[in-house]
């Protein structure tokens, strides 16, 4: 999500073309450019973005409604799915309304505190989604590798504790971001070449040593989402070993099908994230508008796909939806 590969030269070239560039220390507002270089196409770009946003909101609210009204879905996997739906809703609604305001009404100004709030929510709920994927992987691990103890291990109180741990972890790890940003001096520009506030984008505007912030951002990336990826990989290694040890092909396929939805959600979350991270670090010749556009698409793709994946792949949800 973070545009680390955006050079300061590119940022300033866009900034200097805007009349709001000024010298200041404590900005009251930031200017969000939207998709730099594609301003003339903002209205057209907004059409697929608005469509994905509508699908994400409708799909995730549908998941929440179905799980709440169907007693047979009151199980750990579906509780975690509801957490994922809430996370997706907050993640996309924290950025898309402002983004569409930029695209449709050229409303580029954002209050300093509102920018920090948006930054916190975007990063916090992105990390939270990673934690929920880990919790869902643990649920699948217990269900397949130790099925007789699934109901005794993943009780409702345990599910609540796991959910609370996911929320607290993401909240605490991301909390330093807005505090660091608030205490930096800004003296070059208040223009952000993005349609929403990100930690690294705001950090590039500071006239101070931001190495602490940069290193902390890398720490969060590798020690939080990186460890999540390792835990998920270990869980699915054990799951696959258990599946291949089953005596018949039909039993193996039936058991594997219970993991397909979760695997698709993981792939939809981690593969674009990995691609964007590598692109920002190594594809230095890629134009800035493409960097920003891809980052924005990534922000919407998982919230849009997750309810579709579970709606299509999960029989109980599909049957309840078709009633």
Describe each PLM feature range:
Residues 1-323:
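Transmembrane helical core of 7TM receptor-like proteins
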């Amino acid at each position: 999500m973070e545009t680390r590969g955006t050079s300061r030269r590119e940022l300033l070239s866009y900034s200097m073309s805007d009349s709001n560039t000024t010298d200041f220390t404590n900005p009251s507002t930031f200017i969000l450019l939207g998709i730099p270089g594609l301003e003339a196409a903002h209205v057209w770009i907004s059409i697929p973005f608005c469509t994905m946003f509508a699908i994400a909101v409708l799909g995730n609210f549908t998941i929440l409604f179905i799980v709440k009204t169907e007693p047979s879905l009151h199980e750990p996997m579906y509780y975690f799915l509801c957490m994922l739906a809430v996370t997706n809703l907050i993640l996309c609604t924290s950025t898309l309304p402002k983004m569409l305001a930029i695209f449709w009404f050229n409303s580029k100004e954002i209050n300093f505190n509102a920018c920090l709030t948006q930054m916190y929510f975007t990063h916090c709920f992105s990390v939270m989604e990673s934690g929920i994927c880990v919790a869902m992987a643990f649920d699948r691990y217990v269900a397949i590798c130790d099925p007789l103890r699934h109901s005794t291990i993943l009780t409702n109180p345990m599910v609540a504790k796991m959910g609370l741990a996911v929320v607290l972890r993401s909240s605490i790890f991301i909390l330093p971001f807005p505090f660091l940003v608030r205490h930096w001096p800004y003296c070059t520009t208040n223009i952000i070449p993005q349609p929403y506030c990100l930690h690294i984008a705001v950090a590039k505007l500071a006239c101070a040593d931001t190495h602490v912030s940069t290193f902390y951002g890398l720490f969060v990336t590798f020690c939080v989402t990186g460890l999540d990826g390792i835990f998920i990989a270990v869980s699915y290694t054990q799951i696959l070993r258990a599946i291949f040890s089953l005596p018949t092909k039909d039993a193996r396929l039936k058991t594997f099908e219970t993991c397909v939805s979760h695997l698709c959600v993981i792939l939809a979350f981690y593969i674009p994230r990995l691609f964007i991270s590598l692109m920002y670090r190594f594809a230095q010749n890629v134009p800035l508008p493409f960097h920003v556009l891809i980052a924005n698409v990534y922000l919407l793709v998982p919230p849009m796909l997750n309810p579709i994946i579970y709606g299509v792949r999960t029989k109980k949800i599909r049957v309840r939806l078709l009633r």
